[in-house]
Amino acid sequence: MKWKFYSLAFVAGMSILTACSSDDNNDNDGNGGNGNGNEIENGTILKGTITSDVTLAAGNTYKLSGEYIVEEGATLHIEEGVKIIAVYDDIADYILVKQGGKINAVGTPDKPIVMTSEKEEPGAWGGIHICGRAHTNAEGGKGSSEIGGAVYGGNN
């Protein structure tokens, strides 16, 4: 029952705002500037792999193009009021947090974090995939995510 409530709350929160367009085409190689956890500029295109801490600053809008992978040891910080818009193209747009990677998303009721797509229809972006080390019922105790092929599961 809790799962259904949290799923419904997440979907409701995601659908509050609609996507908007930006003419800013800054590219992000994944490490957010110098790779020391600095804030990424407003309007930056998120893509690639991050290997150290990165912060998406409060109130900024970012575009997601393709995969954005958080590797082991890195943390993706998403502050309140951030909007992430998946680019409308033929590439699967998603955020993948691999085992040992972290995501710290802190929205508020007044300033929610919004993740949406330029194409306003269900299934237009791949979502967030968090691959932990919890027990699973997969054969051998581990599985592989459908998007990104990352390993999940274990005995933790």
Question: Which sequence ranges carry the predicted segments?
Answer:
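C-terminal motif of bacterial Sec signal peptides marking the signal peptidase cleavage site
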Residues: I16-A19
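Beta-strand/loop edge motif enriched in small/polar residues
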Residues: S21-N156
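Bacterial N-terminal signal peptides that target proteins for export
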Residues: M1-S7
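Sec-dependent N-terminal signal peptides of Gram-positive bacterial secreted proteins and lipoproteins
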Residues: V11-M14
